[in-house]
């Protein structure tokens, strides 16, 4: 993970896990890079089966699709970009998406990696998308966090 105080990257034990990734189509340059980072992370972690990938129109659609995917996967990653504009719409979308994805995680007991960039500018989003020259790769980070949490949940269930 990136940023001040971030832990060292951990490749979790993923044997037998099923991963799904849902990504928006808005800001395709950025969401495509986030998706590429997520898929690289899944491969680097040693996931045997390729992740299921679903594209949706926008960020508001992420929670309902994440909920459907959580029913059939051990972990889900949600990827998108919301850029602040001149109206309160940004705040409403960000609140809806954040609360919706948290609800999916808690209701389904399936981790949802939060790879939704909520930025003031497109430049900030690009810097977090894993593009050449980016300082961060939030698609990768969200994927590894979701897989790590799924591994912890699996260990807790096995421990009884």
UniProtKB/Swiss-Prot annotation:
Active site residues according to the UniProt entry: 89
GO biological process, alphabetically ordered: riboflavin biosynthetic process
Entry EC number(s): 2.5.1.78
Catalysed transformations (reactions): (2S)-2-hydroxy-3-oxobutyl phosphate + 5-amino-6-(D-ribitylamino)uracil = 6,7-dimethyl-8-(1-D-ribityl)lumazine + phosphate + 2 H2O + H(+)
InterPro entries per record: LS (IPR034964), LS/RS (IPR002180), LS/RS_sf (IPR036467)
Pfam families (UniProt xref): DMRL_synthase (PF00885)
GO molecular-function term, one example from the UniProt record: 6,7-dimethyl-8-ribityllumazine synthase activity
Keyword Transferase attached: yes
Transmembrane segments: none
Cellular compartments per GO CC: cytosol; riboflavin synthase complex
Pathway: Cofactor biosynthesis; riboflavin biosynthesis; riboflavin from 2-hydroxy-3-oxobutyl phosphate and 5-amino-6-(D-ribitylamino)uracil: step 1/2
Binding site for 5-amino-6-(D-ribitylamino)uracil: 26, 59-61, 81-83, 114
Amino-acid positions noted as binding (2S)-2-hydroxy-3-oxobutyl phosphate in the UniProt annotation, renumbered to this chain: 86-87, 128
Keywords from the UniProt entry: Riboflavin biosynthesis, Transferase
Family matches, as Gene3D superfamilies: Lumazine/riboflavin synthase
Keyword presence, Phosphoprotein: no
Function: Catalyzes the formation of 6,7-dimethyl-8-ribityllumazine by condensation of 5-amino-6-(D-ribitylamino)uracil with 3,4-dihydroxy-2-butanone 4-phosphate. This is the penultimate step in the biosynthesis of riboflavin.
Family label: Belongs to the DMRL synthase family.
NCBIfam families: lumazine-synth
Name of the protein this chain belongs to: 6,7-dimethyl-8-ribityllumazine synthase
Lineage: Bacteria, Bacillati, Actinomycetota, Actinomycetes, Frankiales
Gene: ribH
């Amino acid at each position: 993970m990136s940023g001040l105080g971030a832990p060292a990257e951990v490749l979790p034990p993923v044997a037998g896990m099923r991963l799904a990734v849902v990504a928006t189509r808005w800001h395709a340059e950025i969401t495509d890079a986030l998706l590429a980072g997520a898929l690289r992370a899944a491969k680097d972690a040693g996931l045997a089966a390729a992740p299921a990938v679903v594209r949706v129109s926008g960020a508001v659609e992420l929670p309902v699709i994440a909920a459907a995917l959580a029913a059939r996967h051990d972990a889900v990653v949600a990827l998108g970009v919301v850029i602040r504009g001149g109206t309160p719409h940004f705040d409403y979308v960000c609140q809806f998406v954040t609360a919706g994805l948290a609800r999916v995680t808690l209701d389904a007991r399936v981790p949802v990696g939060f790879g939704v960039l909520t930025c003031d500018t497109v430049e900030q989003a690009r810097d977090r998308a894993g593009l050449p020259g980016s300082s961060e790769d939030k698609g990768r980070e969200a994927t590894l966090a979701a897989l790590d949490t799924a591994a912890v949940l699996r260990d807790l269930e096995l421990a009884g």
